[in-house]
A protein has these predicted regions:
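C-terminal helical cap(s) of enzyme catalytic domains, especially alpha/beta-barrels
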Residues: 199-206
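Short glycine/proline-centered loop/turn elements that form peptide/ligand docking sites
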Residues: 150
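Metal-dependent phosphodiesterase/phospholipase catalytic core, i.e.
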Residues: 1-124, 128-131, 135-137, 142-147, ...
Length: 206
């Protein structure tokens, strides 16, 4: 099976895709928004949490993802001193190099979160790795299965926030409900925030 990249298509072609049916039939016909359209939809209502996704891959195709992202933010006065206060911006990436690049480009600085999967665990979820990360990031976003109280404590000791992923009702592991699972991570392990597909089930502090 051939692997396709976004850069293989024009925006007009991408806009023909059905982006909603895979999630729920009631969203059939939903179109893929551009980043600009997402900004216009969310401005003044909620924050933005963009991810530089596979930036090294697209870099080989001639796309400077970090430069394009920063240009879009500045064009919309986001992440600047003139920014809409109800639309804070946090940038996430699995790429340490991408965050390092962004750290040098952003003025004023924005929160930068290094996402961490199982393969990255031994490199970054250690006291030494966390201290190194502090040089270019403000937080970690690990897969939820990688966290325990000690890992959260070490990250906080290094001055990093902790935002695990992804909490959804279809995958709650040992917990009966996603609400119970989110409550455990928030109020037992002490994470600062979390990524969830079910914000409507977000638990309140007991």
């Amino acid at each position: 099976m051939r692997r396709w990249y976004v850069s293989d298509f024009t925006l007009r072609e991408i806009k023909q895709l059905d982006a909603g049916s895979w999630f729920n039939p009631k969203f059939k016909g939903a179109r893929v928004p551009t980043f600009q359209e997402a900004i216009e939809l969310m401005r003044g209502k909620a924050g933005l949490y963009p991810e530089t996704k596979a930036p090294e891959v697209y870099g080989r195709f001639g796309f400077d993802m970090e430069r394009l992202l920063v240009a879009a933010l500045r064009r919309n006065h986001l992440g600047t001193r003139r920014a809409e206060r109800h639309t804070p911006v946090i940038i996430q990436s699995f790429s340490p190099e991408s965050l390092k690049k962004l750290s040098g480009m952003l003025n004023p600085k924005l929160p930068l979160v290094l996402l961490i999967n199982e393969q990255m665990r031994t490199r970054w979820l250690t006291p030494a790795g966390l201290l190194e990360m502090k040089q270019f990031a403000t937080g970690i976003g690990p897969a939820k299965a990688l966290l325990d109280k000690d890992a959260v404590r070490q990250a906080h000791a290094a001055g990093l926030s902790v935002t695990p992923y992804t909490f959804r009702s279809s995958n709650t592991g040992q917990f009966k409900t996603v609400k119970e699972e989110m409550g455990y991570y928030l109020y037992e392990l002490g994470v600062d925030a979390l990524f969830t597909d079910n914000p409507d089930l977000f638990p309140r502090e007991p």
